[in-house]
Amino acid sequence: MNTYVAEIGEIVRSQRRDEEYIEDITERLSRVSKELLGQRTWIRWFPYLKSIASTLYYTSTVVLGNQTLGEEYVHLFESNGLERTVPSIPSRISFVLLHSAFPLISNYLIQKAESTLTHPSTESFLGIPIRKNQKARQSFLDVFFWLRTKLFPQLQRAHIALFYITGAYYSIARRFTGIRFLSASAHSDIPALKVYRFLGYITLIQLAVSIGISLYSFLEQEKFNNKLKKEKKENNGGSDRNLDENSLFHPTFQCSICLENKNPSALFCGHLFCWTCIQEHAVAATSSASTSSARCPQCRLEFQPRDVTPLLNL
């Protein structure tokens, strides 16, 4: 059978179809886990259900050497680069781990690090004392926040832009493992290729502008902070006060997802979660192509990320 290099449109349609099936598996896992394990356990495991569903889906297809349902839909076949050979088992296993498990593990480790940093009893982090050094504590928190909200999303956007321009490696995991797609169809949609390439360049320009704005905002904020510190020193006779350790957590509140008592935030329905958990849940839900809103993990009320209200005086 003759095979051809898969085009961008075919790969995108295949991935969208796979994402639809993964969403369906996630919904089924959610219903089953809620009925069997109870609501409290379900709430705690809800953020991980999509990664579990993705791991199960790709293990039963890619690892076993089968086509995914999306690949069957558009007649695509996985290949070791453009050599027209089946990817090796280690490559397929590595793809599943990088694509499904690595984001979950990295996000979990970052959350645990942030939880450790925000706890007032933590003496040191990575060998650096932070118990009485609130500046170092806040610097670590800023770094992890930047990794989670800036670096990882920007890298994903840059990779998608490169995919639109070159037509190779839809996901970062496929780029690392060298797995590409071959197609059984010989047709070529030149106008669509031009549109995708245009979108790629627009995305890169948007990314560059976003990075420039972020850098400018950071420099302006640093300038403002330095000015504020100088004014405080003048007003306080040269003394510099440390932040109150207890300002980092709230002993009367506990997030029902991560069970931490930090940064309480409320939804319209009245349920409380920590800012990190509910924002990540909302962003993950709204980033899916199948839905435009998230749902409260407890009562399933629809909401947008902008509807989350931080409670600063709890």
From Swiss-Prot:
A zinc finger (RING-type) spans 255-300. The keyword Signal does not apply. Complex locus in which transcription results in the production of one large primary transcript that gives rise to two functionally distinct proteins, wars-2 and prx-10. GO terms for biological process: mitochondrial tryptophanyl-tRNA aminoacylation; protein import into peroxisome matrix; protein ubiquitination. It is a multi-pass membrane protein. The gene is prx-10. E3 ubiquitin-protein ligase component of a retrotranslocation channel required for peroxisome organization by mediating export of the PEX5/prx-5 receptor from peroxisomes to the cytosol, thereby promoting PEX5/prx-5 recycling. The retrotranslocation channel is composed of PEX2/prx-2, PEX10/prx-10 and PEX12/prx-12; each subunit contributing transmembrane segments that coassemble into an open channel that specifically allows the passage of PEX5/prx-5 through the peroxisomal membrane. PEX10/prx-10 also regulates PEX5 recycling by acting as a E3 ubiquitin-protein ligase. The three subunits of the retrotranslocation channel (PEX2/prx-2, PEX10/prx-10 and PEX12/prx-12) coassemble in the membrane into a channel with an open 10 Angstrom pore. The RING-type zinc-fingers that catalyze PEX5/prx-5 receptor ubiquitination are positioned above the pore on the cytosolic side of the complex. Belongs to the pex2/pex10/pex12 family. The chain crosses the membrane at residues 8-37, 39-60, 91-110, 143-166, 198-218. Its EC number is 2.3.2.27. It is found in: Peroxisome membrane. This is Peroxisome biogenesis factor 10. Zn(2+) 2 binds at C269, H271, C296, C299. It comes from Caenorhabditis elegans. Residues 1-7, 61-90, 167-197 are peroxisomal matrix. PANTHER family: PEROXISOME ASSEMBLY PROTEIN 10, PEROXISOME BIOGENESIS FACTOR 10.
